[in-house]
């Protein structure tokens, strides 16, 4: 069994994002290419975005710090600390309204 402090990791990654030229930092918390389930902690400086992209599989976004805006077509969802957003199965983008940290959980599509 492995235990990870998401609070400590969020602080660490947000510090990196704030000083990074692209305003973001990310770390895989669980999973990787050899797993179907992947959890990634993503820190974004206020005003930064994850540009529109395809949904990689079933996914959720757990907002740990700050405020974010998820866009999928005409639909939008606001996220604040403690919110869990079910990611729709379509192209989407994410805007960081404030300095933010999210935990992205994805189960990759197997193409079955």
What are the functions of these language-model segments?
Residues 89-112:
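Ligand-binding loop in jelly-roll beta-barrel domains
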Residues 64-65, 80-81, 98:
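A cytosolic small-molecule/anion-sensing beta-strand core signal
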Residues 57-73:
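Glycine- and acidic-residue-biased ligand/ion/polar-headgroup-sensing regions
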Residues 34-37, 45-49, 67, 109-110:
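Short, charged/polar surface micro-motifs in flexible loops or helix N-caps
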Residues 73-90:
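Short acidic-glycine-tyrosine-enriched beta hairpin
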Residues 23-26, 38-55, 89:
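Conserved short histidine dyad/triad with adjacent acidic residue
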Residues 1-36, 71:
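A short, N-terminal "cap"/entry segment at the start of jelly-roll beta-barrel domains
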């Amino acid at each position: 069994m492995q235990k990870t402090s998401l609070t400590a990791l969020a602080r660490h990654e947000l510090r990196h994002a704030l000083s990074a030229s692209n305003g973001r930092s990310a770390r895989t918390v669980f999973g990787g290419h050899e797993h179907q389930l992947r959890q990634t902690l993503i820190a974004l400086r206020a005003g930064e975005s994850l540009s529109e992209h395809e949904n990689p599989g079933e996914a959720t976004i757990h907002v740990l710090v700050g405020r974010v805006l998820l866009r999928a077509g005409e639909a939008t969802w606001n996220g604040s600390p403690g919110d869990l957003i079910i990611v729709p199965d379509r192209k989407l983008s994410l805007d960081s309204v404030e300095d933010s940290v999210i935990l992205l959980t994805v189960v990759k599509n197997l193409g079955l």
